[in-house]
């Protein structure tokens, strides 16, 4: 197929396909520059600034390393920041390690067409197509109203202090299965039937088949979720904002680091410099860790 050539006023011919391609990539490139590079560069600058004035007249001035000193004091002398980090690591463990393990087992059960496999697939995937805030409302009504009435027990108080983080963590893990199960089942469907048939003839048990045959084949899909989990280890707010808005900050030891940063920026613009400092430090830890995990998983898959 010949190229489309446009003739300019000076008689020069311009490749029309090249112009079309440039126009198509212009929008995403501009979006990347504005909403990623510029925004993150501004966040980097805020880490070295302090808030001056009031909300009617917002001003920032250079603060040097003062925000980093404040962060060090919070880490060493207070418990709120350490509790938030602990909750973030707990969230990562249950969503990335426990959650992925359970999702792989459920996917294998569905792949082998076990008892009620189609029903499990529907139940696990259906929540992922509903808005998160709707799922939060349904979960809260179910736990605090329906279960106490049916079982004649006291409400579990999802919004209460002491149960806010465990309830949000359970919700996050439970409703994160859908996308994983769908991808794992799709990857398992690509496994050659002859390989599985040969394993069956050789008398391979389901556990060995899962460990030796299935998991190596779906490792790229598993790696994707593991890498994403590491990359968001400090920014995952575990749906706490959906349950509590910014009020969970008032509860002792209930916030994750991701929720703390999000809620602090929602509360006041005065918190921007300190939150930017925390975010910059988290990036300095998570970025190399993400690349290391990615490299390790790539070697494991070779």
Where are these regions (language model features)?
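Short, Lys/Arg-rich, polar N-terminal cytosolic tail immediately upstream
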Residues: 1-15
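A structural signal for multi-pass alpha-helical bundles of membrane permease subunits
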Residues: 14-302
């Amino acid at each position: 197929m010949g190229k489309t050539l446009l003739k300019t006023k000076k008689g020069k011919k311009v490749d029309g396909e090249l112009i079309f391609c440039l126009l198509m990539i212009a929008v995403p490139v501009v979006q990347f520059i504005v909403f990623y590079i510029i925004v993150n560069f501004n966040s980097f600058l805020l880490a070295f600034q302090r808030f001056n004035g009031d909300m009617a007249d917002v001003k920032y001035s250079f603060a040097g390393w003062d925000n980093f000193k404040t962060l060090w004091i919070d880490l060493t002398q207070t418990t709120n920041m350490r509790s938030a980090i602990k909750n973030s690591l707990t969230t990562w463990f249950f969503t990335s390690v426990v959650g992925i393990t359970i999702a792989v087992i459920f996917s294998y059960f569905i792949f082998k067409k076990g008892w009620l496999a189609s029903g499990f697939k529907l139940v696990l995937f259906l929540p992922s197509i509903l808005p998160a805030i709707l799922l939060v409302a349904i979960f809260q009504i179910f736990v605090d109203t329906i279960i106490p009435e049916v079982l004649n027990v006291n409400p579990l108080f999802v919004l209460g202090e002491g149960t806010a983080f465990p309830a949000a963590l359970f919700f996050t893990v439970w409703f994160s299965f859908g996308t994983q199960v769908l991808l794992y089942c799709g990857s398992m469907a690509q496994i050659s039937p002859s390989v599985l048939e040969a394993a069956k003839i050789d008398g391979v048990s389901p556990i060995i088949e899962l460990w030796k045959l299935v998991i190596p084949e779906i490792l790229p899909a598993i790696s994707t979720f593991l890498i994403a989990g590491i990359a968001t280890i400090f920014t995952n707010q575990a749906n706490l904002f959906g349950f509590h808005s910014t009020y969970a900050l008032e509860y002792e030891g209930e916030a994750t680091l991701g929720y703390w940063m999000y809620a602090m920026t929602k509360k006041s613009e005065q918190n921007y410099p300190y939150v930017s400092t925390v975010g910059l430090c988290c990036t300095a830890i998570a970025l190399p860790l993400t690349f290391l995990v990615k490299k390790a998983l790539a070697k494991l898959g070779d």
